[in-house]
Amino acid sequence: MEKLFIPKGYKPLLSLRETEVAIKELKDFFEDSLAKNLNLTRVSAPLFVNKGSGLNDDLNGIERPVSFDMKAMPEFNIQIVHSLAKWKRLALHRYEFEHGEGLYTDMNAIRRDEDLDNIHSIYVDQWDWEKIIDKEERNLETLKETVRSIYGTFKATEDFIVAKYPHIEKILPEDITFITSQELEDRYPDLTSKERETAICKEFGAVFIIGIGGKLASGEKHDDRSPDYDDWTLNGDLLFYYPLFDEAVELSSMGIRVDEESLLKQLKIAECEERKELPFHQMLLEGKLPYTIGGGIGQSRICMFFLRKAHIGEVQASMWDEDMIRTCEENNIHLL
């Protein structure tokens, strides 16, 4: 059994059947609101890609994708996606989207090397979204404006759920707070990055941490990011304080994507310049792909947060070891 936290005296606010109904209602409302607020069109998404395309998300660079071959095309090494971070940018180009327009997908992924706990599963379901911007819009104001729009969807969703289920109380603050990862380190120099996240979220309730992937003044990173989609100076994580855990919980990771210059710079820093030869990276360096902003929003995380669940397995069906299943059952945590 991996790390498991049992909230003292936990009792679910909804039954199993009520939970399933609420999940559908919540997802439908959030999806519609997000699409309207960001001007997004839903598109079909791949479950797997060819390794040689360079389209899979390498995450932190050490996670192993699930891979397989197929009888019809034995020459291909096919990978289950980790996310669609790079695929979406290519799709905007292929589908001929215009400036100010975007797309979103229902993304399903398998992350086989995930460490299992209350909020982590090997099954990942999220809304992956991407939107075209101008090069001149690659700045912090564009990032913040987009974060505020997304936070508006979170606020509207909380209102919707509380109206449906009055015994669930509101906990989100009126506004989102912005802070850079360096400001956060300066504020809490003796804490780890995760401890900093909880400290700042306990103070403000909802926080967007700007600038993730590059090294801070201490020489450490706030967190890892793949070098070939987010610009590490124009990205961030959206976190909420979750009273049930007395911790910060990340609901979304997003950012303005790399341009030609930042891609080359970050590939060099990450010591993986060989990726420049992959088809996706070649298109980007040749100026064939649009400038974009995009991210992923965890569907199960959102359901868990708004329905006040103690374990992500209460809102999604996945794989858990017998010790975790038994311990959860003994503590009123009913895994699907």
From Swiss-Prot:
Alphabetical list of PROSITE patterns matching this protein: AA_TRNA_LIGASE_II
GO BP field: L-asparagine biosynthetic process
GO CC, alphabetical: cytosol
Domain of life: Bacteria
Keywords carried by this UniProt record: Amino-acid biosynthesis, Asparagine biosynthesis, ATP-binding, Cytoplasm, Ligase, Nucleotide-binding
Top-level enzyme category: ligase
Residues passing through the membrane, by range: none
Record-linked Gene3D superfamilies: Bira Bifunctional Protein, Domain 2 (3.30.930.10)
Predominant cellular place of this UniProt entry's protein: cytoplasm
Name listed for the protein in its UniProt record: Aspartate--ammonia ligase
Organism: Clostridium perfringens (strain ATCC 13124 / DSM 756 / JCM 1290 / NCIMB 6125 / NCTC 8237 / Type A)
Lineage, opening ranks: Bacteria, Bacillati, Bacillota, Clostridia, Eubacteriales
Gene: asnA
